[in-house]
């Protein structure tokens, strides 16, 4: 209860699908006993019904950013039952790194797979996953076998960004330039669970 969870997901793709449903069940059971149980949710953008709808339906989200398209969550926001920060998507990661948004307790990130040397094969979206994995105290990974193995190699994860005043231009000058890694990095000491799923994306 009260934790801030950074979840993967961007335009209905690559969001976690198992853990949010299980969390919603726990929250509903706690509320039935009269216990207060809500979480703060950060994402890359919109997600899917297994995340926003499931948690909003049981009044499980205390605070949400930066974007929402779920009708159940929208009703909670507009009625004042859920706090919401409608911010530009590009501002989320820098503000998280600068500490403006507070502590990130848990990262819950869907991946396509994990390499033998511990690198993460990104799923069908990346969003703020790099930031969540770096900033969170604990990490839960959802490995989704529904996602195509062909996703390995199409991403370009850039690890050269810095905060002002040390920030420099991203060295991307041509449409076919690659400046980063095919994989997301993770500290294995922070990984507390790996959950398997085969559920499809909303989009």
Where are the regions that the model predicts?
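Conserved alpha/beta enzyme-core scaffold
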Residues: 1-203
């Amino acid at each position: 209860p009260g934790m801030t969870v950074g979840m993967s997901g961007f335009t209905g793709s690559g969001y976690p699908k198992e853990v949010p449903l299980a969390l919603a069940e726990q929250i509903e059971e706690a509320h039935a006993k009269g216990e207060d149980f809500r979480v703060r949710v950060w994402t890359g953008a919109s997600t899917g019904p297994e995340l926003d709808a499931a948690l909003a339906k049981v009044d499980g989200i205390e605070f949400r950013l930066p974007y929402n398209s779920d009708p159940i969550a929208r009703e909670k926001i507009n009625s004042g039952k859920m706090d919401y920060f409608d911010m530009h998507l590009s501002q989320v990661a820098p503000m998280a790194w600068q500490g403006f948004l507070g502590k990130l307790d848990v990262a819950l990130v869907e991946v396509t797979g994990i390499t033998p040397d511990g690198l993460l094969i990104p799923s069908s979206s990346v969003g703020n996953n790099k930031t969540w994995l770096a900033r969170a105290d604990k990490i839960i990974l959802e490995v989704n076998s529904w996602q195509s193995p062909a996703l390995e190699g199409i991403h370009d994860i850039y690890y050269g960004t810095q905060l002002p005043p040390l920030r420099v231009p991203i060295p991307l000058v041509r449409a076919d330039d690659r400046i980063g890694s095919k994989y997301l990095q993770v500290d294995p000491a922070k990984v507390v669970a790996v959950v398997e799923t085969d559920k499809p994306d909303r989009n």
